[in-house]
Amino acid sequence: MDEKKKIEELVKTLNEASEAYYNGQDEIMSNYEWDGMFDELTRLEEKTGYILPESPTQNAGFEESNGEREAHEYPALSLAKTKRISDLQVWAGERPVWLSWKLDGLTLVVTYDNGKLVKILTRGNGTVGSNITFMKDAIEGIPKTVKYKGHLVVRGEAAITYTDFELINDTIEDDDEKYANPRNLASGTLGLDKSNLDKVKERHIHFYAFTLVHLDETMSSWGERMDYLEKLGFTTVAHELTDAKGLEEVVERWTKKVENGEMDIPVDGLVICYEDNDYAQTGSVTGHHASRAGYAFKWQDVSAETTLKYVEWSCAASTISPVAVFEPVALEGTTVSRASLCNISEMERLGIGEDGKTTLDIIKANKIIPKCIGVKKKEGTFTIPEFCPVCHARTEIRISEH
């Protein structure tokens, strides 16, 4: 395929996946697949110099909201990312850096004047966001007033815990209507209108501050800025001071917390930023990234091959859903033998076959949830049950509206 056509195809596919991911719809690809396609697009753009304006490499994100569109006072740019600790060490150089979680929610920017909350904007495309100030009483963790009389701008992540996510999904009877993950639910919730504020409040979306964007007074220490936010009443993202020499140990230790299931707040990586906030502001802007604002680290997805034994059809409410049951395989410190296949469309996309010889490629998404990302070798075809395995009623295929 011509490289320019390949770029156009990748942009279209990635944008469709991003729109589904950010706007409360069903996921159409895994983070693992998205990252791989994004990296391929980046390489092709660098090689050819052919960059479409709508390319995801040029945009911070996708979202829909019922709020009025409004320009950001300070652009909310995305961060460059890597999967190599060595890149973080080079970026840190000889300077102390702070490591924190990369929370998997929706970025918001909150503004205060004379001690009062005056604005809540979503990140949008990084330049223009949606004004959702009308949700100020429904989002937890955003103080209505602060003990500061100047102009204050704070950036943070609005997220839903796994505990609340599971409780909310349990109230949805139709499996096809359930949310794919907490990020998906948070984004869909913040896209609701003023008539649904009670529903927003019931979902316990919490704001976690990760950057003090503007303060009238000079405060050059990133750590002091975070301490100040805590004094003002914000919940800040967890953070730890380190340097290039200590980064590997800190990253490994924090990663273990995710692998051991200690995190109730969804995360999809780590972030480092300079302790010297003044130095961080001196970087250039390349593409849609501020070169010294921070550096994101995403975990390498460790995959393992295994053989599919059979597909089990799991019943919940009025829906039966496919689950891959495969030969046990060691992955990320645990042994896994089952993974959801979501629905019939996903089985068809993957190319699932059921004759005991189909080879699957399995990962643990975000180091937690087993997920089938591909079929290495397909043997046979799969069979859709004619009758429910529980109540024995005749089955029918339904197409989700989403």
Show where each model-derived region lies:
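Short nucleic-acid-contacting surface segments enriched for D/E, G, S/T with interspersed K/R
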Residues: 345-360
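Short, conserved beta-turn/loop elements at beta-strand boundaries and strand-helix junctions
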Residues: 115, 313-317, 377-379
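Long, charge-dense accessory insertions within large macromolecular proteins
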Residues: 86-89, 157, 162-348, 370-371, ...
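Phosphate/adenylate-binding "loop-and-lid" substructures adjacent to NTP/NAD/dNTP-binding pockets
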Residues: 1-146, 184, 258, 265-267, ...
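A short beta-strand motif that forms part of the nucleic acid-binding face
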Residues: 113-114, 122-125, 325-328, 343, ...
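Long, non-coiled-coil amphipathic alpha-helical linker/lever segments
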Residues: 148-159
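Structural signature for extended repeat/solenoid scaffolds and their inter-repeat hinge/linker regions
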Residues: 364-402
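Hydrophobic beta-strand signal
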Residues: 273, 358-363
